């Protein structure tokens, strides 16, 4: 998906694969060729294979809440003590999890690591962006309250939904391309046609 693809690109750019031995799992492409990041080759492993997952020290998942809700509790109940790093929202409110946004809460992350926390999750994208811009104001007690309203973007649904959105945008553009190419055409007429 989109989140995983962006993560992989960033890890390549920052040479993170130089320091780890990655094993790649999939919920839908078991047995296909795995990415060759970090100089490793092989096939995609079964993301539902608890025994294989239990052998790992760290699991990074961008699979989504359904996967997390199914696999995470089973792993923890089996005694797995590894680090779970997750982009899904499922674990955000758990007492044994920390939402990670290191420019804002590095001290909380460090304290958690020092105190045995092993579950780290990404925050809501809109809230994370807001905190990146307002974090210093919060840290200096300069904000009484914030009211935020958002609309979940298509990107939150993953690559398939982004592709669908772009296809729909293309159809809309095709429907009004002539009018858009004419500077004198009225935008409200174009909007009504769409």
What is the predicted role of each segment?
Residues 1-194:
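N-terminal Rossmann-like NAD(P) cofactor-binding subdomain of oxidoreductases
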């Amino acid at each position: 998906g989109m989140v995983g693809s962006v993560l992989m690109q960033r890890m390549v750019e920052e040479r993170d694969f130089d320091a780890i031995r990655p094993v790649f799992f999939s919920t839908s492409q078991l047995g296909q060729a795995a990415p060759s990041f970090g100089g490793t080759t092989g096939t995609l492993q079964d993301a539902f294979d608890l025994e294989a997952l239990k052998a790992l020290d760290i699991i990074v998942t961008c699979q989504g809440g359904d996967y997390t809700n199914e696999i995470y509790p089973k792993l923890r109940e089996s005694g797995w003590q590894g680090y779970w790093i997750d982009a899904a929202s499922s674990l955000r409110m758990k007492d044994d999890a920390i939402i990670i946004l290191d420019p804002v809460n590095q001290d909380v992350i460090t304290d958690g690591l020092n105190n045995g926390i092993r579950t780290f999750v990404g925050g809501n994208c809109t809230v994370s962006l807001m905190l990146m811009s307002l974090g210093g104001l919060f840290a200096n007690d300069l904000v009484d309250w914030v009211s935020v309203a958002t609309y979940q973007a298509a990107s939150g649904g993953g690559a398939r939904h982004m592709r669908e959105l772009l296809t729909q945008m293309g159809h809309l553009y095709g429907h009004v391309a002539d009018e858009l190419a004419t500077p004198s055409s009225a935008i409200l007429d174009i909007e009504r046609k769409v």
